[in-house]
């Protein structure tokens, strides 16, 4: 059995390079980071947790592709992935290039986890909802 780590990485948490080193040193197989381009200030969509308020971490997530590139640069074996990338909110050509570049630069260790997302307000800002 293989175990991995998923984390909402923000400007208030451990940095991508430090986290990736720690995850690999402790024998985990993978590191996955989620994606949110932004959280609209005015929202109608309830949090997926069922809580009244959205957790602060959703408002402060780092870009997973940039953070995973940092992680790739300081690790050798760690599988790196998006958990998940919100592909409906992204330009497909730019995304394909980012994914291919990250996979190449990581030595084939990138896993492209994709999904649609839950935040209707965020989707609307991208012209998707």
Language-model features: locations:
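Structural motif corresponding to the early beta-alpha repeats
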Residues: 65-73, 79-88
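Hydrophobic residues within beta-strands of alpha/beta enzymes
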Residues: 31, 80, 110-112
């Amino acid at each position: 059995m293989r175990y991995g780590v998923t984390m909402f990485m923000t400007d208030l948490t451990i940095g991508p390079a430090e986290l990736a080193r720690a995850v690999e040193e402790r024998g985990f197989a993978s590191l996955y980071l989620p994606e949110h381009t932004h959280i609209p200030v005015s929202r109608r969509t309830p949090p997926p947790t069922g809580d009244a308020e959205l957790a602060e971490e959703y408002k402060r997530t780092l870009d997973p592709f940039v953070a995973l590139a940092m992680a790739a640069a300081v690790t050798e074996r760690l599988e790196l992935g998006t958990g998940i990338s919100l592909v409906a909110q992204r330009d497909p050509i730019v995304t394909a290039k980012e994914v291919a570049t990250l996979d190449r630069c990581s030595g084939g260790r990138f896993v492209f986890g994709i999904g649609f997302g839950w935040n209707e307000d965020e989707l609307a800002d991208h012209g998707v909802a």
